[in-house]
């Protein structure tokens, strides 16, 4: 396969609690088109437990995936023999679910003698704006989800440099934990956003973690503790208390995020020149308050903000299919020995950040 061909790729996503499959077309000029994109959320299965249960997720993927793939192929109006490749998220994620998706992709590829592409789930998020907006390299990616918070220089397919990451909780994880702490239903992120809209963001003086540091790392554990302490002090909580706590928490996250992104964009410019865009991806990018804050950051940095539609920010099969197509266009395929991975760094050279290392000159 070469970049001069039109490619048709099936993508499978099973890394967490969405069972998804999609068919995407990548044209010779590098543009793309989604032919189908089927996502089945497992929210109902996990809601009684207040979070994702890995074994339940894996079993649900087993039960659902064949039907989801069949529907994706049917809606795309194509058959397996017409596919140029089969892509599956091979990690990072909950290993049981990753095994289900990757094994299914291998079976399809083997039976139909079709190339297999084992996709890094994070790379799929990183490349989505090239599908939705034909974004050119290099660009600065803000990836924020329940499991990841990273600022990444995206220089090309397979070429990523992590500029910043969280030293403790991911942003989406923190939203979910605050929701659970305050007794809000699962999934917690949208519930916190909804409550915050009716709250007083200045009632509580919550900390803004990492503000003013020259690096681009995040930390949310101290903020989470501050919210817990206020909630404990006010117990029993009135509905307005919950709204105000959510509003104060979200405002602190927005201030911290804006500061960290400003540092990340500065680091990007110092190392790689001006980015073609600031791109936001991951489920957290569906939060409208976060989108507004991102627009302000991009405007101050005099760069373009690109945020894919909400359905393509959260986990989906189209992003896996597109990443597979991008890799396939470069001749990058995988053997049947491709292993599922619970952990898989986007930047293979990245190291764990030190929470208080190299924070200020002379510190």
UniProtKB/Swiss-Prot annotation:
Cellular compartments annotated: Cytoplasm
The residues that the entry says bind Fe cation are 121, 125, 315
Q: Which UniProt keywords apply?
A: Acyltransferase, Cytoplasm, Iron, Metal-binding, Transferase, tRNA processing
Cofactor: bound how, per the entry note?
A: Binds 1 Fe(2+) ion per subunit.
- GO cellular component labels: cytoplasm
> Is the keyword Cytoplasm in the record?
yes
Kind of enzyme, top EC level? transferase
Q: Which cofactor does it need?
A: Fe(2+)
Enumerate the GO terms in the molecular function aspect: iron ion binding; N(6)-L-threonylcarbamoyladenine synthase activity
Instruction: Read off the SUPFAM superfamilies from this record.
Output: Actin-like ATPase domain
A single GO BP term for this record reads: tRNA threonylcarbamoyladenosine modification
Q: What is its EC number?
A: 2.3.1.234
Known catalysed reaction(s)? L-threonylcarbamoyladenylate + adenosine(37) in tRNA = N(6)-L-threonylcarbamoyladenosine(37) in tRNA + AMP + H(+)
Pfam families registered for this protein in UniProt: TsaD (PF00814)
> Where is substrate bound in this sequence?
143-147, 176, 189, 287
State the protein's purpose: Required for the formation of a threonylcarbamoyl group on adenosine at position 37 (t(6)A37) in tRNAs that read codons beginning with adenine. Is involved in the transfer of the threonylcarbamoyl moiety of threonylcarbamoyl-AMP (TC-AMP) to the N6 group of A37, together with TsaE and TsaB. TsaD likely plays a direct catalytic role in this reaction.
Q: Which family does it belong to?
A: Belongs to the KAE1 / TsaD family.
Q: Which HAMAP family match?
A: TsaD
Q: Which PANTHER family match?
A: TRNA N6-ADENOSINE THREONYLCARBAMOYLTRANSFERASE, TRNA N6-ADENOSINE THREONYLCARBAMOYLTRANSFERASE, MITOCHONDRIAL
Q: What is this protein called?
A: tRNA N6-adenosine threonylcarbamoyltransferase
Q: What is the lineage of its organism?
A: Bacteria, Pseudomonadati, Pseudomonadota, Alphaproteobacteria, Hyphomicrobiales
